Amino acid sequence: MSMPSVHVSNYGCSANLAEAEAIKGVLVKEKRYSLAEQEDADVLVLNLCTVKGDHQSLRAVRQAREKNPNAKIVVTGCVTRTLREQVQKQYPDVNITNTNNLHLIQETVAKTLDGESVIHIAGAKEQKANLPRIRTNPVISIIPISTGCLSTCSYCSTKQVKGILKSYPLTTIKKEFDESLREGCKEFWLTSQDNGCWGYDIGMNPAVLLKELSHYRGDDEEQKDYRIRYGMTSPQHFLKDKEAVLEAFHNERVYKFLHLPVQSGSDNVLKGMKRDYTAEEYEQLVQDIKKEHPTMTIATDIIVGYPSESDDDFEQTIGIIKNTHPHISNISRFARREGTTSAQL
């Protein structure tokens, strides 16, 4: 009898990609399942992202069904309550778990193959470092450093799924880093919902992590050639640790890249979004970064169409883009998410 086959599709950020790699690693570790292309697999696992709304996730389910009508489907990832309800209504035979239940993925797939109904939404936070992984790129190690965040952004539904910050211990992160280095990885992506607050709940900060990982401790000359990519950080946290983090970026092993989402150039909108900084503070932060590291690449995120945004607010956002000259601008239209405070506006 042939081994049941699974295909894992990923949508969204690098944190989601790390989880998709872990899902594949966990599923094949005990040799109970094999991996297959989407059109050939017995089970399709869809690791979804709902940061911009549920419609893209529902489209992913529909397209998966169209591509492989005979496969059973498991939905996981950042599954909000509204997405769960819509999937149950439109696709009642699709099983559902979420990002907090990665440890149950083998059980979920097994029950799915047996025709059982599975809904795993509740769940305590689990540590997602040091899990078996099947990497998308064999030389890139995506290392989750925490889950959840400390922000209360009015438009964000991810907080409903991920919850409050839980930093992974430095020793745990170092263990995965060292193992990945021995396995031949040359590039390390540090990922989470917000790298900027890593360590705040365990008496540390991101500068400690960057300095520890960028100072190689071994004797293998080949393993000394690696780079670290520091993921997204909220400006209010970067402001707290600015000097120490910028000092860590002087190590040649740390990519000169920062993802600092501004979201709006209007203080009125930023206040409504519950972003804990002003437009002036953001502009000064970017100036300080460029002064310390002239070659730094800066990416930012912008939300347009926030419910309280006026024409003048919009012009102020254009102004902050002109003043800070980000190398990368990710622009999104405001999406009303049920359960968020901005949904009431």
Language-model segments: residues:
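Conserved N-terminal phosphate-binding loop of PLP-dependent enzymes in the Aspartate aminotransferase
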Residues: 242-243, 325-326, 341-344
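Short clusters of hydrophobic/aromatic residues that line enzyme substrate/ligand-binding pockets
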Residues: 121, 270-273, 342-345
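Short low-complexity, flexible loop/linker segments enriched in glycine and/or proline
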Residues: 45, 170, 204-205, 245, ...
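Conserved SAM/AdoMet-binding glycine-rich loop
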Residues: 73-74, 82, 182-311
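Proteins enriched for Cys/Gly/acidic motifs involved in redox and nucleic-acid/cofactor modification
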Residues: 1-197, 211, 258, 280-291, ...
